């Protein structure tokens, strides 16, 4: 199962032309794993932008569980892999990126089946099993960083792989906090980007992913403008093939 195109398409929106000067600087992030830890900053297009990337679930909570060829697919493993890939691309473009959920061992993985673990932490702290405590912990982490960061463009991105859609074709769904005009703008731009890229690369597929308000704890309680994405469903056979 792989969501490579998601990373690319998100970047069409997130790579804002703040200062699109080419650069060649070395970078290093151990969370990406030994093979991917080293990277080069090749552009300053996102210089001054800060992103708080949060993968769903983790630690004692695997999230939604799918079955594929005799293996269990845990939502948290795939959401985390997507977050790492997205974060690496953002950092290559000069952005400052905070990974709120972390696994010191996994790194970016290319296997079709990602092994499951409970090692994930919230920036080094054990993740509680209690749902409210778990969500509060990650919101507190985002907000503490948000208060310290000086940049003007600061956005939080939450990624889950448990879409409520049960159709054979599961699209990406975009949510923002109730009453958040900036959140609505962010999610609508994401939606339009996906629609455009599907028309370009898969013109016969169609795209029905919607934008809506959703009264989620993490959207209500994070200080930066936030988008919550359901990028598929780990239990959906078609998504498992992706």
Feature annotation, model-predicted:
Residues 2-5, 9-11, 15-242:
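Catalytic-site microenvironment of enzymes
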């Amino acid at each position: 199962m792989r969501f490579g195109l998601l990373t690319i398409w998100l970047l069409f929106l997130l790579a804002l032309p703040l200062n699109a000067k080419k650069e060649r600087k070395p970078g290093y992030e151990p969370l990406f794993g030994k093979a991917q830890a080293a990277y080069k900053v090749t552009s300053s297009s996102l210089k001054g932008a800060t992103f708080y990337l949060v993968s769903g679930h983790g630690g004692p909570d695997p999230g939604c569980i799918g079955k594929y060829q005799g293996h269990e697919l845990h939502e948290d493993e795939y959401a985390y892999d997507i977050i790492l890939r997205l974060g690496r691309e953002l950092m290559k473009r000069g952005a400052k990126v905070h990974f709120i959920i972390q696994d010191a061992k996994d790194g970016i993985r290319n296997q079709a089946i990602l092994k499951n673990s409970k090692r994930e932490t919230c920036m080094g702290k054990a993740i509680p099993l209690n749902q409210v405590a778990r969500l509060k912990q990650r919101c507190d982490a985002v907000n503490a960083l948000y208060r310290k960061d000086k940049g003007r463009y600061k956005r939080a991105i939450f990624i889950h792989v448990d879409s409520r859609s049960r159709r054979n074709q599961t699209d990406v769904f975009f949510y923002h906090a109730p009453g958040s005009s900036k959140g609505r703008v962010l999610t609508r731009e994401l939606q339009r980007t996906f629609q455009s890229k599907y028309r370009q690369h898969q013109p016969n597929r169609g795209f029905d992913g919607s934008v809506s308000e959703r009264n989620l704890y993490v959207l209500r309680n994070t200080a930066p403008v936030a988008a919550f994405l359901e990028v598929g469903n780990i239990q959906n056979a078609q998504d498992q093939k992706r």
